[in-house]
Amino acid sequence: MLEIAKIVELAKEHATPMYLFDLDELQSRVQAMKEILGEDIRLCYAMKANPFLVDSMKQAVHKFEVCSPGEFAICEREQVAMADI
């Protein structure tokens, strides 16, 4: 979990409003979902609101849902396997 001091430091550096994601926490929650749902359930990341998380999610989820040529281009740029889109 991000410390308050780090959040304040980032807010001063980048201004607000801003989006801040704790990637370790995200990975932990995805892993917890996998454990709860079991091996028969495959996770798909819908990248609509957060396309900048594609690289971080590549190893965590099974598939990526794209709804536009731009989203597809992001997956290509991040070298997501075509079979996973």
Name the predicted role of every residue range.
Residues 1-85:
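A charged N-terminal "starter" segment
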